């Protein structure tokens, strides 16, 4: 795989991945301060970090115990680099354990803590500058530090945690037992900002303009005079990739828009009009709907759906590429969240993403993924910076597998049509209500469940459609949107009256976690 990444002269803070469910949020929060940040494996060596030249390092939380035989470790030379290090939860315990302190099961020193707790600051610290002496933080640990290494001192504790914050300012080493990256730590952003700006000396000048200039340079360096194929899905991500690549390599880019029969209502024509017309991208439109739907017939398992679609998507590309000369690269709109949710060596796979785990091993192309260091809100900001109109940039997110993962169970034309029509009504009414910017994502799902109803004087036995609407910043966590009842009522009434084979509407009021945004 060809990795499109950030050039070496950018200030960056590296987050070492120890398997926490929150580790991606650490990088996301740091980026909010205008500082580039990304995750790296905990197996990285001190020499590799020297080559990256970060201004700071964060050791993430994790599910293991630092004293266990299978515990994730750290190259001890990293502590000698002179780079500021912040250990969070497991990261603090790792610093303690490796530098001569003591970590034990929490029952031997206070209690386990899961949830909000009050942090009591006992000394002033640059890390906590501008925050109150007592503050609510999110704890999530089953082990505790009982002895701190030589050169460290106590900064803060809680009722159940004797060492909740420690530091060795001489060596620029800091440890906190709680999670500042989550919103339940009320002053968590201030703490992370203090680390990035005050302790690491970040300038805070990272922006989308930086990203555009450096990614264009990197793309040109990687591609040279060769040709690139881009798959357009109709979503924001691939559209932004198309405009970025066109700026970088011009007519070396050919876009293939594969109509796999799983698109939203009128999506094909809209894609051709927006990107082919307004931006002049060279787009080949391929009607492969029968090819995909035949393969998906009777397939119920969502992971199998994703794999089938991912494989066939690339085989369609192979077929089209064989008609072209000298195509070496396949571009995708893979995001940072896609990579994270598809699993790392320390974290379990949540779901395989079409842009990550669904590609065949015998693929003929090298991959280019210009957005794979960005979160969704950053992609929108990138689109605006590229001069794209808001109707494209704020287009509703749409997964690569399309409506296949918005139809529960086996896919049929009838089920697909219920989702297409109901989704169009939902989007129309959300826009009419002026909520299209407040609600981060919204769509409908054919649940595959039929229920009894009465329409007119007759009995019906038709599908139940679920409405999913969420609010979020980056897609990693989300709350269900509290839509006004009158809006929901109008949407429900219209769907039942206007969409055939539907007689019941339900509203999904589940947050992420525990649920994911998509149902499959």
From Swiss-Prot:
- The entry marks the following residues as binding ATP, namely 233-239
Against Gene3D superfamilies, the record matches this protein to: 3.30.300.10, 3.40.50.880, HUPs
Specify the Glutamine amidotransferase type-1 domain's residue ranges: 12-205
Q: Which UniProt keywords apply?
A: ATP-binding, Glutamine amidotransferase, GMP biosynthesis, Ligase, Nucleotide-binding, Purine biosynthesis
**A GO CC annotation given for this chain:** cytosol
Please give the catalytic activity noted in the UniProt record: XMP + L-glutamine + ATP + H2O = GMP + L-glutamate + AMP + diphosphate + 2 H(+)
User: Which top EC class is named for this enzyme in its record?
Assistant: ligase
NCBIfam families linked to this entry: guaA_Cterm (TIGR00884), guaA_Nterm (TIGR00888), PRK00074.1 (NF000848)
Q: How does it assemble?
A: Homodimer.
What role does this protein play? Answer: Catalyzes the synthesis of GMP from XMP.
Name of this chain's protein = GMP synthase [glutamine-hydrolyzing]
Q: Which gene is this protein's source?
A: guaA
